Amino acid sequence: QHWEKNFSNKPEMFGLEPSISAIKALEIFKEKKITNIIELGAGLGRDTIFFAQNSIKVHALDYSPSSIKIIKEKSKKNNLDHLISTEIFDIRKKLRQDSGKYGGCYSHMLYCMALSSFELLKLNDEIYRILNHQGINIYTVRNENDGDYKNGIHRGEDMYENDGFIVHFFSKDKVKSLLKGFKNLSIEKFNEGNFPRKLYFVVNKKI
């Protein structure tokens, strides 16, 4: 609700260009010959559009109705409706998709939202279920080197609230705790934005 209230009024707050993580993810999807992915927490669709422009079929999920509306508008404007489908969805629930449906899953900063470790484990199980044999899950999270870590109101585990937003910060151990059914291929550090946010770029392969 906080996201909906703040970002739907400033629809280009995260920029129009694809994120660094989407550019890196595309290389991996292309290398693995993955052509259909699910994107969780698609936001305003800057990465969704980028993937589709590079011939990847994307099913974009987001909790915010206004975000999904913006993605649909962008998809239509860019003549990408044949490659982009959307769904308003709360990822704390069981995903509606069939088992083994996707070659890849992508999410940028979804795992570091206000989700408990238990909710993250359940989400990871669902991602495992919907990925096909040797499917790839790529996600990014803000890490313990981020300037906001341990700032603001502590909300349990490694979650801190700043300006109304709760962020779940990740250590490498926390990344490794989410490997049930997966093999980690890489954990890479990168920065984003002017602050900058300090993140991990995580690539896991279904086994």
Tell what function each PLM region has:
Residues Q1-K30, I38-K94, K122, I136-I207:
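Class I (Rossmann-like) S-adenosyl-L-methionine-dependent methyltransferase catalytic domain
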Residues L121-H133:
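A short glycine-rich, Lys/Arg-flanked "PGG" loop and its adjoining helix->strand segment in the class I
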Residues Y106:
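A conserved beta-strand element that flanks and buttresses the S-adenosyl-L-methionine
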Residues M109-M113, F118:
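Short catalytic micro-motifs in class I SAM-dependent methyltransferases
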